[in-house]
């Protein structure tokens, strides 16, 4: 008889424990239901990239002194810099400059260490093509300024989702309070 009462007591404790776990899961679900969706309908809606976003590299041919610092600091020696030495002015003359974005890891070292600031990162991230050879940009393609997301009239810009609301990185803080209450 005593073992039967003890069994019912264990069963009751397990039932209460299961109800706690179900309540915790339900509170997490309710917490997520109150949040705004994080996805956008991509071709028609776009998020504005942050100021530190590392997009396609922009190159200014006139500022480049062909020092090749960008090649030396690149982890994969990616930029191809061709130059000729002009004897009459005793300087290097840049003849061509290219970057293959199919290989580039967008680390930004070339931009950071360029002594003349002829390289900069843009907010352009739409680089997909059907042919990988089209990702090899020469100085003409690199010099083209991208159309800003804000200036494009064919899409709806969503600026409210560029930064997460305060407290979203805390995880399920509301559900933790509920679980502490249930304990």
Curated annotation (Swiss-Prot):
Domain 4Fe-4S ferredoxin-type residue range list: 55-84, 95-124
UniProt: [4Fe-4S] cluster 2 binding residues: 74, 104, 107, 110
Reactions accelerated catalytically: a plastoquinone + NADH + (n+1) H(+)(in) = a plastoquinol + NAD(+) + n H(+)(out); a plastoquinone + NADPH + (n+1) H(+)(in) = a plastoquinol + NADP(+) + n H(+)(out)
Primary subcellular site in the record, as a coarse category: plastid
Membrane association type: Peripheral membrane protein
EC number: 7.1.1.-
One GO term of the biological process aspect: photosynthesis, light reaction
Disulfide bond residue pairs: none
Requisite cofactors: [4Fe-4S] cluster
An example molecular function term from Gene Ontology annotations: iron ion binding
Assembly: NDH is composed of at least 16 different subunits, 5 of which are encoded in the nucleus.
Function field: NDH shuttles electrons from NAD(P)H:plastoquinone, via FMN and iron-sulfur (Fe-S) centers, to quinones in the photosynthetic chain and possibly in a chloroplast respiratory chain. The immediate electron acceptor for the enzyme in this species is believed to be plastoquinone. Couples the redox reaction to proton translocation, and thus conserves the redox energy in a proton gradient.
Protein's UniProt name: NAD(P)H-quinone oxidoreductase subunit I, chloroplastic
Gene this chain is encoded by: ndhI
